Amino acid sequence: WIMGHMVNSIAQIDEFVNLGANSIETDVSFDKQANPEYTYHGIPCDCGRNCLKWEYFNDFVKGLRRATTPGDSKYREKLVLVVFDLKTGSLYDNQAYDAGTKLAKNLLQHYWNNGNNGGRAYIVLSIPNLNHYKLIAGFKDTLKNEGHEDLLGKVGHDFSGNDDIPDVEEAYKKAGVTGHVWQSDGITNCFPRTLKRVRLAIANRDSGNGIINKVYYWTVDKRSTTRDSLDAGVDGIMTNYPDVIADVLSESAYKNKYKIATYEDNPWETFKA
């Protein structure tokens, strides 16, 4: 999965897919009542990027729906996965459940079109704080209560705080999550970071008894780091330059080992070579 980083305006969806992304990451900020409000990152953000692009969350999600609904004039077949980077740092811990509820209602209406030919992309809910695990329950309970439990088949999870893997597993246990787990590792492109924790996450993924299904590394903008990540065995790379990742994937060392994921590739299944 080539994951376009910080895609927060509708125009950027096309921009990143045109560069080779089959997945995007979108920042979601919340208001004081735990409603998803804007797709917005703000300052500081990655070096070399405009941090200030934004939409109202509802508007972005409607644009995203069009980009991922077959038959729509804006449909982009290649875009199959969306990571919502949930900026829950502005919320109190006891608002996490509410945030999950409100996010689910919003996506149900504006993305899934109440289950009536909505967007088809797989969605990863990425939470920065392990203490906010109740957001997952709020989200799941709401879809069940609204009669759309089937849509949970399209939803996966990530804790993005670079916590120790056993602590992440513990949070999932509390949240009742047993699958659909992506594990991120990384740092802003302004600083280097070793692949040490990525390798631990990959070991968990491949152990057969860990909780992790997929591992992605962020934010990777250089060819050398891309190669190191692929050599380590990641499933996804988050980047400001999807064309760089696509270029490296076409090199002889990688083109027979990796393929760019399509809608037919299940993002919740651990890949066995």
Swiss-Prot record:
This is Dermonecrotic toxin LruSicTox-alphaIC1d. It catalyses: an N-(acyl)-sphingosylphosphocholine = an N-(acyl)-sphingosyl-1,3-cyclic phosphate + choline; an N-(acyl)-sphingosylphosphoethanolamine = an N-(acyl)-sphingosyl-1,3-cyclic phosphate + ethanolamine; a 1-acyl-sn-glycero-3-phosphocholine = a 1-acyl-sn-glycero-2,3-cyclic phosphate + choline; a 1-acyl-sn-glycero-3-phosphoethanolamine = a 1-acyl-sn-glycero-2,3-cyclic phosphate + ethanolamine. It is an enzyme of class 4 (lyase). Expressed by the venom gland. Its cofactor is Mg(2+). One of its GO terms (cellular component) is extracellular region. It comes from Loxosceles rufescens (Mediterranean recluse spider). Its EC number is 4.6.1.-. Binds 1 Mg(2+) ion per subunit.
